[in-house]
């Protein structure tokens, strides 16, 4: 842990993310940006996450910098190599029962009193109470799209109105989930299947209750932060602005960070290579360099999606038969209960046009000129990175807000093709060929439009830049009170 710079009194913000890769990445980016704006930062990870960073990025990656320190609290659960896949009930129970006291104990021992807390929205189960006990304000940072938040928010209403649970399993396939819901403000045309809900899940499921109850607490907090930009989700942002006193749309964060001159970046923070909890393989960039512009499909299903060996094999044959180059990220724990090993015959076919790696710097890959398409699980981090890079998508959502993101990618933003839930090699082949061929021309143009609109949002007078400045001013005022 680094020694804090205390020669000048600065607003002091404590960040606490939900302990998962995508949440931490989005939190760290905002923390870096506010640090560059002159705020003092304490970033709190769990012990387990802290150690994962040290393993993936080296022993000095969390040394911090003047005015930026990393701290840890124990998460109270045991961990195995597959610990985060899927999110375990034991972690959620520990968050609800153990994190409050541990977090308060940490904060009260810090050398400088904090100005405010920026909490992951899904940790509001204890951070709202912590803020009250500490006597400091809290801001909620929702590291998902505004449409994803709104979807989670209205699951309670779906249950109250009798749309869920399903009467029986036949409702999964009889067209019922195509029912259009017309009473969610700002989300015209949304279908039941587009809500962030696994419709086969018991409504008493711990993960479901945890994720749907968090937005219901949002009215207890006046400041809410969303990693999106105004022009991407205007009707939903308008609805949220009427609902809460202070809304900050601040994305895409990486584009804002890219504006910081290299000489002003703090090496003790930026050494977190890609903000990844897994060691990255740089060899894929040598392979990308050998390919023509817009000729490669990038394939990555995120850090927590899992599938059957049959599904992975179908993806493999579909990609191999498409006759397009592809970079495929296959995590060791991608397959449920088995090693992620492809059949030897398929491996031979893949060698002709494919490159397989276990992890990579996704944002660098998406920005590479050879990449022309992205086969994705539609996690929000992946989605906003793809939009920022102007790369169209093939969508295979796994769960939760990925389902909502898929709807917006394909129908509202018109930059994606949706796959069926059941993976079939012929469909994979067809969609890759459509995306990369003449059929994808309109999507490529729309993707370029969104890339430009994202850059307008982060320009000096853009909506996201102005919101970051408003947030800094608000926190500075809090520090003086």
Curated annotation (Swiss-Prot):
- One family from Pfam that matches here is UDPGT
Cell inner membrane as UniProt keyword: no
GO MF terms, alphabetically ordered: quercetin 3-O-glucosyltransferase activity; quercetin 7-O-glucosyltransferase activity; steviol 13-O glucosyltransferase activity; steviolmonoside glucosyltransferase activity; UDP-glucosyltransferase activity
Which signals induce this protein? Answer: Induced by blue light and red:far-red light in a ratio of 1.22.
State the UniProt keywords alphabetically.
Glycosyltransferase, Transferase
Q: Which residues bind UDP-alpha-D-glucose?
A: 143, 362, 377, 380, 382, 385, 401-402
In this chain, an anthocyanidin is annotated as bound at 23
Gene3D superfamilies membership = Glycogen Phosphorylase B (3.40.50.2000)
The active site consists of 23 (proton acceptor), 120 (charge relay)
Which reaction(s) does the protein catalyse, per the Swiss-Prot or TrEMBL entry?
A: steviol + UDP-alpha-D-glucose = steviolmonoside + UDP + H(+); steviolmonoside + UDP-alpha-D-glucose = rubusoside + UDP
Further information in the entry reads:
Leaves of the 'sweet herb' Stevia rebaudiana contain a mix of steviol glycosides, compounds that are unique in the plant world because of their intense sweetness and high concentration in leaf tissue. Stevia leaves have been used as natural sweeteners in South America for centuries.
**Its family?**
Belongs to the UDP-glycosyltransferase family.
Protein purpose: Involved in the biosynthesis of steviol glycosides in leaves. Converts steviol to the mono-glycoside steviolmonoside. Converts the mono-glycoside steviolmonoside to the bi-glycoside rubusoside.
What is this protein's name?
A: UDP-glycosyltransferase 85C2
Q: Which organism is it from?
A: Stevia rebaudiana
């Amino acid at each position: 842990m680094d020694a804090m710079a205390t020669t000048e009194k600065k607003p002091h913000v404590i960040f606490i993310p939900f302990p998962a890769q995508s949440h931490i990445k989005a939190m760290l980016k905002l923390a870096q940006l506010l640090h560059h704006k002159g705020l003092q930062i304490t970033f709190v990870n769990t012990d387990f996450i802290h150690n994962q960073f040290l393993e993936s990025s080296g022993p000095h990656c969390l040394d911090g910098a003047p005015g930026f320190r990393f701290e840890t609290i124990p998460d109270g659960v045991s961990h195995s190599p597959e610990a985060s896949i899927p999110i375990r009930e034991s972690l959620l129970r520990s968050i609800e029962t153990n994190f409050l006291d541990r977090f308060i104990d940490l904060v009260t021992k810090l050398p400088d009193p904090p100005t405010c807390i920026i909490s992951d929205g899904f940790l509001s189960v204890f951070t709202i109470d912590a803020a009250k006990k500490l006597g400091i304000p809290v801001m909620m940072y929702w590291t998902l799209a505004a449409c994803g938040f709104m979807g989670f928010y209205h699951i309670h209403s779906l249950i109250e109105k009798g749309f869920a649970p399903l009467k029986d399993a036949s409702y999964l396939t009889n067209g019922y989930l195509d029912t259009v819901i017309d009473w969610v403000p700002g989300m015209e045309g949304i279908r039941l299947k587009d809500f962030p809900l696994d419709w086969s899940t018991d409504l008493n499921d711990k993960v479901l209750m945890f994720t749907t109850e968090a937005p219901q607490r949002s009215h207890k907090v006046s400041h809410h932060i969303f990693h999106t930009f105004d022009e991407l989700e205007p009707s939903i942002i308008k609805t949220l602005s009427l609902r809460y006193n202070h809304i900050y749309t601040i994305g895409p964060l990486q584009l804002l960070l890219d504006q910081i001159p290299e000489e002003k970046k703090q090496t003790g923070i930026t050494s977190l290579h890609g903000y990844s909890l897994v060691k990255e393989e740089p060899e894929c960039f040598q392979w990308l360099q050998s390919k023509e512009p817009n000729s490669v499909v990038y394939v990555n299903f995120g850090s927590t999606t899992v599938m059957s060996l049959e599904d992975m094999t179908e993806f493999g044959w579909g990609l191999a038969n498409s006759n397009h180059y592809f970079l495929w990220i296959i995590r060791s724990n991608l397959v449920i209960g088995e090693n992620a090993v492809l059949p030897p015959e398929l491996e031979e076919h893949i060698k002709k046009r494919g490159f397989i790696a276990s992890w990579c710097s996704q944002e660098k890959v998406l920005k590479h000129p050879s990449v022309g398409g992205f086969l994705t699980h539609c996690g929000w981090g992946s989605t906003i990175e793809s939009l920022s890079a102007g790369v169209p998508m093939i969508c295979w959502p796994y769960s939760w807000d990925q389902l909502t993101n898929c709807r917006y990618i394909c129908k509202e933003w018109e930059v994606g093709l949706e796959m069926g839930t059941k993976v079939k090699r012929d469909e994979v082949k067809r969609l890759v060929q459509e995306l990369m061929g003449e059929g994808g021309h309109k999507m490529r143009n729309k993707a370029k439009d969104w890339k430009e609109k994202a850059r307008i949002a982060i320009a000096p007078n853009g909506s996201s830049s102005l919101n970051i400045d408003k947030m800094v001013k608000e926190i500075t005022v809090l520090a003086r009170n």
